[in-house]
Structure formats: structure tokens, C-alpha cells
Design a protein with these regions (language model features):
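HhH-family (HhH-GPD) DNA N-glycosylase catalytic core used in base-excision repair
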Residues: 1-267
């Protein structure tokens, strides 16, 4: 029937008010995105933001305390600290930094690899864009290439470091890197929007337990696990609802589960 409301329009009408509810500055203080928000220089924001996203699991109060400790160890100059990092000179600052399964050796090696990337490209933005094909529909190829090169920058990189840096080609949902890219690319009250060479239309949804509950309620994925195929499926559905900014719906999916609120049944 002409003028009939489509399923995507129904879902957008349900989800858009949830985005408006949760995508506010009030969200920032208790979220790891608050850490890069604490810096003014975009170079500092992208560097410390990478650590904040990569370590984003477990209790939030514990995570934020650990990230504040990391900032202090870097003398609150993450770009300078990482860019000029020397293991013999600076490794001691990270010698006892632990967050859950992330050990001091992981911190040293990750910082070593990021330092090499900054020395080669000047910024993590440039390092990422170097691996994102022109016209790519989503950021998947960029994530894969960026992580692959990062791990290859030093042939001595321990195998255990790889488990902290997921790749789509391994089937992983790459939740933390998808979240990092949302922070870097999307402008808004919560996200930083400092990477202008990547379009918000290319972003994918970070999938986790909280967001998956809402995604399943809305019938947006037929897959039972949070893998890269599920990421592509959900992101494509969100792209159909909002072609220029699919990742905005992360707030609608994550917010209710994280706060324990019940938004009511979807249409």
C-alpha cells in the first residue's frame, strides 16, 4: 500500500528516542570515553583513547581508576610518552600496570608497537586510513590491515599480545576497536569526532552482552554469536535505518542494558 510504514521506519521510530535519551554528556563521566575527553590535544585523545577502548572490560569504576593510573604513568602526555617510548628508559613506568588479563609485558609491547606506528605515520588516524580502501562500505578492512601491520612492526612481538588486538578476518566481533572508531569518528556530545578522514557511514556496531539483548529483541540478527558476520549484519540493518550514521544506534542498544531500564517492547 502506498505510504505504508516500513519495518525499518518502525524500528527507527522506536530506537531514535532511545538514542536521544542515552547520547548525552551525562553518559560521559562513568564511561571509558571520559578518559580521552580529559585531554584537549587530538593527538593525546587518539592515543589514550586506544588504551581506554582496548582495556574496556570489567567494573567501570575499576577500569577508570586503572586508566587514570596509566595517564599518570605517562605524565599526562600520552602522545609524547608513546611517540618517544624507549623500553629501557620508559618501560619501568609500566612495570606493574595490570588490568585483568592485561599484564605489564602487554602494556610495554602495546606501547612499543603504537610508538612504531606513530613514528611511521605521525598519527593513529593516518595509520588506520592507510589500510582503509577508498570507497569501502565499512571499516572492517581498515581494522584488519591496521592490526595486522601493528603486530608486524616488530617481529619479536609475543604471541600473547595478539589476543588483545582482534581482527575481522579471524571472525572476531572486534568490539573494542569498533567502539574506539566510534569515539574517534562520530561527532557528538559523547564521541570525539576527531578523525575526519573516515566517514561515520562506514562505522560498525560494537556488540556485547548488553547491546545484544536489545538487538535480539529488535530482530536485527539471525546469528547466535557475536562474531564479525553478526557485526556486519546488524550494522547493515542500522545503515538501512540511518545511512549516514549507523553507529548512533549503539546508544539505543547499549543504554537500556547498562542502566537496567526497560524501554518497552519493540514494534
Amino acid at each position: 500500500m502506498p505510504g505504508a510504514v516500513t519495518r525499518d521506519e518502525e524500528l527507527a521510530a522506536y530506537l531514535d528516542p532511545l538514542v536521544a535519551r542515552y547520547e548525552t554528556e551525562a553518559f560521559i563521566a562513568s564511561d571509558p570515553v571520559s578518559i580521552p575527553h580529559g585531554f584537549d590535544d587530538p593527538r593525546d585523545q587518539e592515543v589514550i583513547g586506544f588504551y581506554a577502548a582496548l582495556l574496556a572490560w570489567g567494573r567501570r569504576d575499576t577500569l577508570l581508576a586503572k586508566l587514570e593510573s596509566l595517564c599518570s604513568r605517562m605524565a599526562f602526555r600520552p602522545y609524547q610518552f608513546v611517540g618517544s617510548f624507549d623500553v629501557d628508559r620508559d618501560g619501568g613506568r609500566l612495570a606493574d600496570f595490570v588490568h585483568r588479563t592485561f599484564q605489564p609485558s602487554d602494556a610495554v609491547w602495546l606501547t612499543r608497537l603504537l610508538s612504531l606506528a606513530l613514528q611511521k605515520y605521525g598519527s593513529l588516524n593516518a595509520a588506520f586510513v592507510a589500510h582503509l580502501p577508498a570507497g569501502s562500505r565499512d571499516v572492517g578492512p581498515g581494522i584488519d590491515g591496521f592490526v595486522r601491520e601493528l603486530l608486524e612492526l616488530d617481529e619479536r612481538t609475543p604471541e600473547r599480545v595478539r589476543k588483545h588486538l582482534a581482527r575481522p578476518s579471524s571472525g572476531s566481533a572486534c568490539k573494542r576497536l569498533a567502539m574506539y572508531l566510534r569515539w574517534m569518528v562520530r561527532p557528538g556530545p559523547v564521541d570525539l569526532g576527531i578523525w575526519t578522514r573516515v566517514s561515520p557511514s562506514q562505522l560498525v556496531l560494537p556488540l556485547d552482552v548488553h547491546s545484544r539483548r536489545m538487538i535480539d529483541r529488535c530482530g536485527l540478527s539471525g546469528r547466535r554469536t557475536n562474531d564479525w558476520k553478526a557485526v556486519e549484519e546488524v550494522s547493515e540493518r542500522c545503515r538501512e535505518m540511518c545511512p549516514h550514521d549507523p553507529a548512533r544506534y549503539d546508544f539505543a542498544f547499549f543504554g537500556p542494558g547498562a542502566t537496567g531500564e526497560d524501554p518497552g517492547p519493540p514494534p
